[in-house]
């Protein structure tokens, strides 16, 4: 049988004797009828010093929990950054660093912030960022993409030229084929393609681009595009060169732009080159 000594503990602060009976949710303090709160099976004295110590302990536990969560969040963010294919030198960017010196730059900022909020709300919009060379299209897209990564979203970044080169590389690869590369880009949670139209595609390349955009359109996946060209000019730019008879088939180019613009909001950047 358990002795009384084994069922008592002494408050280290005030010296009161506390009776501990396993299984009780609360226990009277020995010597009076004051109730004591239990943490598990451990009685906590209600003296001022004990309450202060308990609160301090709980604060330390909470601080440790928050520190662990912050560390784990930073590690997850770092992994998403690495998987995004974005240059490490960009990783400090964010929309807060986007300069808003002109009404156009402010409008671009507001539109990018609104797009990010739609993504966070669970929507699946796309974004079309156009403007002359040097007006900040890549900067704006990268700032937005990095903010999305920090918020917990997975992003895949690629220059369109690099995408096409990765597709061409499958010609001599035994490990990857076109379908593997297309699916890699088509399945990305959020895809950012930089400089669409800079490289005029062949008929084959245009078909591969359409396959990616069409699947993303069908899957409802957000896509962010930067380009120097407006809709009509982009169609011309994505149309393969004319054949021997002088005929240029723009069917695929029109289909690409249709898929891009179907669910996309538009940001038009203006002004002189910042480079």
Outline where the language-model segments fall.
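A short, basic N-terminal segment
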Residues: 1-101
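N-terminal pre-Walker A segment at the start of P-loop NTPase domains
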Residues: 95-122
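Short glycine-rich substrate-engagement loop in P-loop NTPases that contacts/grips substrate
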Residues: 106-112, 146-187, 200, 207
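Conserved catalytic network of the ASCE P-loop NTPase/AAA+ motor domain
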Residues: 119-122, 148, 183-186, 214-219, ...
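Walker A/P-loop nucleotide-binding motif
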Residues: 121-141
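Loop/turn-to-beta-strand initiation segments
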Residues: 125, 153-154, 187-190, 219-225
């Amino acid at each position: 049988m358990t002795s009384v000594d084994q069922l008592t503990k002494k408050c280290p602060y005030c010296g009161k004797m506390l009776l501990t009976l396993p299984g009780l949710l609360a226990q009277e303090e020995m010597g009076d009828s004051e109730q004591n709160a239990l943490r598990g099976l451990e009685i906590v004295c209600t003296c001022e010093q004990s309450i202060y110590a308990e609160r301090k302990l709980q604060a330390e536990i909470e601080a440790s929990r928050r520190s662990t969560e912050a560390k784990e969040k930073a590690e997850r963010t770092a992994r998403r950054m690495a998987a995004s294919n974005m240059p490490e030198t960009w990783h400090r960017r964010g929309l807060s660093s986007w300069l808003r010196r002109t009404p156009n730059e402010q409008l671009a900022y507001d539109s990018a912030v609104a797009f990010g909020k739609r993504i966070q709300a669970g929507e699946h919009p796309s974004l079309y960022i156009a403007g002359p060379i040097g007006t900040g299209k890549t900067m704006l897209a990268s700032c937005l993409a990095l903010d999305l990564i920090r918020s917990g979203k997975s992003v895949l970044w690629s220059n369109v030229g690099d995408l096409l080169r990765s597709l061409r590389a499958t010609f001599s690869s035994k490990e990857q084929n076109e379908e593997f590369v297309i699916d890699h880009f088509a399945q990305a949670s959020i895809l950012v393609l930089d400089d669409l139209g800079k490289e005029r595609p062949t008929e084959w390349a245009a078909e591969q681009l359409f396959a990616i955009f069409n699947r993303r359109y069908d899957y409802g996946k957000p896509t962010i595009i930067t380009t120097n060209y407006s809709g009509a000019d982009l169609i011309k730019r994505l149309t393969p060169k004319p054949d021997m008879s002088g005929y240029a088939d723009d069917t695929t180019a029109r289909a690409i732009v249709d898929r891009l613009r179907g669910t996309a909001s538009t940001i038009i950047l203006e002004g002189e080159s910042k480079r």
